[in-house]
Amino acid sequence: MAEVPELASEMMAYYSGNEDDLFFEADGPKQMKCSFQDLDLCPLDGGIQLRISDHHYSKGFRQAASVVVAMDKLRKMLVPCPQTFQENDLSTFFPFIFEEEPIFFDTWDNEAYVHDAPVRSLNCTLRDSQQKSLVMSGPYELKALHLQGQDMEQQVVFSMSFVQGEESNDKIPVALGLKEKNLYLSCVLKDDKPTLQLESVDPKNYPKKKMEKRFVFNKIEINNKLEFESAQFPNWYISTSQAENMPVFLGGTKGGQDITDFTMQFVSS
C-alpha cells in the first residue's frame, strides 16, 4: 500500500496541527517559499498530489495528508505579481493610504488672486459737453479750454484702465492715467473737502487690477454722455467750469453750473 511520506523535521517545526490554519509560518523553509513563488511550475487548476516513498515514518497519514492539502490551498490563494508595475496602478492604493480632507480658509485674500491679473486699457481723450478739451496746466493740474487746429495736440491723452471695483449694469470702475506719464487722477480729502488731483505713481506697480480706491472712478453712460463718479466719495464727479481755461475739479452737484458730462474719443496706441 502506498504511503504519503512524512515531512522532514525542519519543515515539521513550522507545521500546525489545526486543520483550519495555513499550516506554515511566514519564516518557514526557504525551499517551500520558492515553490510557492514560482507559480508557473504549479498550475492553479492542479489537484492534490501524492508522492510514493519506500521509507516509513512514525508520523501518521492524517498529518501528512493535511500538510499536502494546506500546500494546495496556498498555491491557489497566491497570485503572481505582474512583471511590469505601471504608474497608474498606484491610484488603486491611494484611497487606502490617504484620506481626503477639505481645506477651509478663514479669510479670502483677493489681492493674491488679482495681483498678476492682466489690466485691460484703452487710450482716449475727453471733452466736456461744451466741447472744451483737457490740457496740462503746470505739473499736477488739468484745465479745460477750447482748442482748434494744431492746438488740438495739446489735449491730454488718457490711458483708461478697467479695474476692480463695485461694477454694476450702469457703472464701470476705471482708473484714469496720463499716457506715457506716471500720473493718475485721484480723489483725496483736503481741508475737509473731496479734491481732485494728479498723483505721481511708481510705473513698476501701476496700472494694476486692484487700484487703491482713491484712483477709481465709476464710469456712467447716460444718453451717449459719460460721467466719472469718485469711488472714494460717492456723488462727487469730475467736473469743469462754464468759464474758459479753468481747472478741472471734483464737484458735488449735477445739472447746475458745473459740467459733469463728457464725450470720449478713442486714440490709437
Curated annotation (Swiss-Prot):
InterPro entries referenced in this protein's UniProt entry, alphabetically: IL-1_CS (IPR020877), IL-1_fam (IPR000975), IL-1_propep (IPR003502), IL1/FGF (IPR008996)
Gene3D superfamilies, alphabetized: 2.80.10.50
Post-translational modification: Activation of the IL1B precursor involves a CASP1-catalyzed proteolytic cleavage. Processing and secretion are temporarily associated. (Microbial infection) Cleavage by S.pyogenes cysteine protease SpeB promotes its activation independently of CASP1.
PROSITE patterns: INTERLEUKIN_1
Induction (free text): By LPS. Transcription and translation induced by M.tuberculosis and a number of different M.tuberculosis components in macrophages; EsxA is the most potent activator tested (at protein level). In pancreatic islets, release is increased by high glucose treatment. In pancreatic islets and macrophages, release is also increased by endocannabinoid anandamide/AEA.
GO biological process: apoptotic process; astrocyte activation; cell-cell signaling; cellular response to interleukin-17; cellular response to lipopolysaccharide; cellular response to mechanical stimulus; cellular response to xenobiotic stimulus; cytokine-mediated signaling pathway
Keyword Lipid metabolism: no
GO molecular function term, any single one: integrin binding
SMART domains assigned to the protein according to its UniProt record, in alphabetical order: IL1
Activity modulation comment: (Microbial infection) Cleavage by S.pyogenes cysteine protease SpeB promotes its activation independently of CASP1. SpeB-mediated maturation of IL1B plays a dual role depending on infection site: while IL1B inflammatory response prevents bacterial growth during invasive skin infections, it promotes streptococcal infection of the nasopharynx by disrupting colonization resistance mediated by the microbiota.
Effect seen on changing residue 244 to K: Increased affinity for integrin ITGAV:ITGB3. Suppression of integrin binding. Suppression of integrin binding
Site residues, Important for interaction with integrin: 171, 179, 181, 190, 204
Site feature (Microbial infection) Cleavage, where: 105-106, 115-116
Chain location of the short sequence motif Involved in interaction with TMED10 C-terminus per the record: 228-241
A GO cellular component entry from the record: lysosome
Outcome, altering residue 181 to E: Suppression of integrin binding. Markedly reduced activity
Sites annotated Involved in receptor binding: 120
Tissue expression as described in the entry: Expressed in activated monocytes/macrophages (at protein level).
SUPFAM superfamilies documented for this protein: Cytokine
Effect of residue 204 to E: Suppression of integrin binding. Markedly reduced activity. Markedly reduced activity
Keyword Secreted tagged: yes
Assembly, per entry: Monomer. In its precursor form, weakly interacts with full-length MEFV; the mature cytokine does not interact at all. Interacts with integrins ITGAV:ITGBV and ITGA5:ITGB1; integrin-binding is required for IL1B signaling. Interacts with cargo receptor TMED10; the interaction is direct and is required for the secretion of IL1B mature form. Interacts with HSP90AB1; the interaction facilitates cargo translocation into the ERGIC. Interacts with HSP90B1; the interaction facilitates cargo translocation into the ERGIC.
Further remarks about this protein from its record: The IL1B production occurs in 2 steps, each being controlled by different stimuli. First, inflammatory signals, such as LPS, stimulate the synthesis and promote the accumulation of cytosolic stores of pro-IL1B (priming). Then additional signals are required for inflammasome assembly, leading to CASP1 activation, pro-IL1B processing and eventually secretion of the active cytokine. IL1B processing and secretion are temporarily associated.
Homology family: Belongs to the IL-1 family.
Name of the protein this chain belongs to: Interleukin-1 beta
Species: Homo sapiens
Gene name per UniProt: IL1B
